[in-house]
Amino acid sequence: SNLILARGDTFLYFYPYWDAAAEALRHGRIPLWNPHLFMGAPFLANSQAGFFYPLNWPVWLLLPTPYAVSASILLHLLIAGVGAYLAGRQTLGLGRWGGLVTAVLFALGGYLTAQVEHINQLQGLAWLPWFLWVAARVFRSRLGNRWVLVGQGAVGFALLFSLQLLAGHTQTSFITGVMLIVWGAAHGLEKWLLRDSPHGLGLSFQWRRFYRRLPLVLLMGGGVAVLLTAVQLLPTFELIQQSSRQGGLTPNEVLSF
């Protein structure tokens, strides 16, 4: 119609995959194989198609592919903004206006909006600030049973990691893990710098509580997420074994990419 604003991977990669996935879903079929690419290629095992990502199904069933992509972009920018707002309020102790500025900067900033061409990356990154919100609620809480808080954190991390993995961009989960490590290290630096402050004992207690809970939450949440997403991870892992890049890339190839 010449009315669709799309370029690069959106138009050439995701539109065809989403259209094929939507057609399969409407016919109650799991698309294991793609017969339209070369002499055929695995479809489900290509995690970037995001067939099992739960927020893809409604837009696939209700909207034509171009509108489905647009709706998903808007939805996940909203999810990212709400998550950034809550994370800013809970993690940094910001007020309403500070949280709003955080939401706008994250959801409409250059990095996230640049990923609208890579819908699976946008979908995964939209959940990133929600990890900070869950972590802050669990690790900073002084109330409640320790194991209840650990369980709540593990459930939250499991659901969020599952959504990221099913969105189809595994690197986003890696980025999230690095973020949580940096966040923990920043907490450690904060506690060390304030060790002689009048609130030192309280900070020391929070510091010990933080490191008692963090490994448990990450291990439990990550383990449950792997089980929940095995329906996607196992076919993808099998496909990786057949890849020409299965042995990894040379440093020169990594840097040039």
Language-model features: locations:
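Amphipathic helix/helix-loop-helix segment enriched in hydrophobic residues with interspersed Lys/Arg
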Residues: 186, 210-214, 242-245
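Membrane-embedded helix bundles of polyisoprenyl
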Residues: 75, 79-91, 96-145, 149-190, ...
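Membrane-interface coil-to-helix junctions
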Residues: 1-81, 104-126, 252-257
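A glycine-rich phosphate-binding loop feature that marks nucleotide/adenosyl-phosphate handling sites
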Residues: 180, 220, 241-245, 254
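Juxtamembrane inter-helical linkers in multi-pass membrane proteins
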Residues: 198-200, 247-257
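Helix-to-loop transition at the C-terminal end of transmembrane segments
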Residues: 1-12, 230-247
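Membrane-interfacial, low-structure loops and terminal tails that flank and connect transmembrane helices
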Residues: 142-149, 190-215
